[in-house]
């Protein structure tokens, strides 16, 4: 069950801190280098801690804070006071363009089903203003797609597109359950699908 798996994952991640993030990033980058990978896209937490390790490694990377918003979409939302959005702003001010552009900061959401349109639109506006890219997990499982279709009558890609999500350069991780129409639309917007083979293997996709 996707919801239960996500809840268990969030409980584990809630115990993390920047020290844990740095250790995990160091191991992850070492594994990348082992296979000759020198450029990464990272969508997770603690972007500043990740940027520190990336800077030391000499690798190139696009880093995004995996933002989420579970509260009622009717509740007030203010980009200028939201904790995650302000963490993003700080990371952009500190790290975006570091070392002649070797490190770039993107905006990001975890996924369609862990956020809502107020966050999407605020991040898209900020990304457009600052010339940033966008990252997200998209259509990783059929359960995710079916859930969105049941709620809205649209696929996750279609729903996000209604809110002009793909009008900024977008990197979508997963993409294993896109429809033909989704693929055509993402191609139209020149979105990039990022391959995540280990994640897909763990999920049985």
Roles of regions detected by a PLM:
Residues 1-7, 13-29, 148-161, 173-187:
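Short, composition-biased local secondary-structure segments
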Residues 1-59, 84-98:
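Alpha-helical scaffold segments that flank or form the walls of functional sites
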Residues 165-205:
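Active-site-adjacent C-terminal substructures of enzyme catalytic domains
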Residues 37, 59, 131, 190-191:
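A structural motif
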Residues 40-47, 113-114, 175-179, 199-201:
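Short beta->alpha connector loops
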Residues 11-14, 33, 37, 109, ...:
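Short, basic, glycine/proline-bearing loop/turn elements
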Residues 51-176, 183:
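Metal-coordinating catalytic core of metallo-dependent amide/deamination hydrolases
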């Amino acid at each position: 069950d996707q919801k239960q798996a996500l809840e268990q994952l969030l409980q584990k991640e809630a115990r993390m801190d920047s020290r844990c993030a740095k250790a995990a990033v160091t191991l992850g980058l070492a594994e990348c280098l082992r296979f000759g990978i020198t450029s990464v896209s990272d969508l997770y937490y603690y972007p500043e801690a990740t940027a520190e390790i990336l800077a030391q490694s000499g690798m190139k990377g696009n880093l995004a804070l995996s933002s989420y918003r579970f509260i009622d979409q009717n509740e007030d939302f203010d980009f200028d006071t939201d904790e995650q959005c302000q963490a993003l702003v700080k990371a952009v001010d500190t790290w975006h363009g570091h070392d002649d552009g070797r490190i770039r900061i993107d905006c990001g959401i975890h996924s369609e089903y862990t956020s809502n349109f107020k966050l999407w639109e605020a991040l898209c506006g900020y990304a457009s203003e600052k010339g940033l890219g966008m990252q997200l997990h998209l259509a990783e499982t059929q359960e995710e797609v079916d859930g969105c279709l049941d709620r809205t009558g649209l696929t996750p890609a279609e729903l996000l597109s209604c809110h002009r999500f793909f009008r900024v350069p977008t990197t979508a991780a997963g993409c294993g359950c896109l429809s033909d129409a989704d693929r055509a639309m993402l191609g139209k917007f020149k979105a990039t699908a990022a391959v995540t083979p280990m994640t897909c293997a763990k999920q049985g996709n």
